[in-house]
């Protein structure tokens, strides 16, 4: 684990080399009204962080959903041009999540996929892909949230919003 931790800075730098592509993609999403993030297992937790950042700084309605729950009502919200971001960092859940994303695409959704390098077959399914380096599953969240945070950041910048002072947010401090 210690060896893997030592590789994280280099892996983060590799992700940041893709920030211009993420910025370009974000500039195309400035008029989005809804963004849905879908994933399974730990990817669902990553989706919750991505959705939170999207809401907090871009003021776009955003929700995170467990991909396996899409058929329980959520799928009825999918319509033309809604952005659906699929997080697919776990190889054992990859095919199931892709299947859920295809259901969204069949209803007109615009798909972004976030997966690990080497999973280039995703480009046959999604409209835009961001890759992260493979890492120990314990650290996947540390890498996967970066492109999602950048997406929210660059959408906010493209909208002319002050990302350093989001409206209606306050820091919480507990004094005992």
Segments (PLM) and residue ranges:
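A SIS-like phosphosugar-recognition module
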Residues: 1-176
């Amino acid at each position: 684990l210690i060896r893997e931790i030592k590789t994280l800075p280099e892996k983060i730098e590799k992700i940041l080399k893709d920030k211009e592509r993420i910025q370009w993609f974000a500039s195309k999403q400035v008029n989005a009204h809804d963004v849905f993030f879908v994933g399974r297992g730990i990817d669902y937790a990553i989706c919750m962080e991505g959705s939170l950042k999207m809401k907090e700084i871009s003021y776009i309605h955003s929700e995170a959903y467990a991909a396996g729950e899409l058929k329980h009502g959520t799928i009825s919200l999918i319509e033309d041009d809604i952005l659906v971001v699929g997080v697919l960092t776990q190889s054992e859940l990859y095919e199931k999540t892709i299947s859920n994303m295809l259901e969204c695409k069949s209803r007109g959704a615009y798909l972004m996929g976030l997966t690990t390098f080497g999973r280039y077959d995703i480009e046959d399914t999604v409209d835009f892909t961001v890759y992260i380096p493979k890492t120990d599953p314990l650290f996947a969240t540390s890498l996967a949230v970066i492109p999602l945070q950048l997406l929210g950041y660059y959408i906010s910048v493209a909208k002319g919003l002050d990302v350093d002072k989001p409206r209606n947010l306050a820091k919480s401090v507990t004094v005992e």
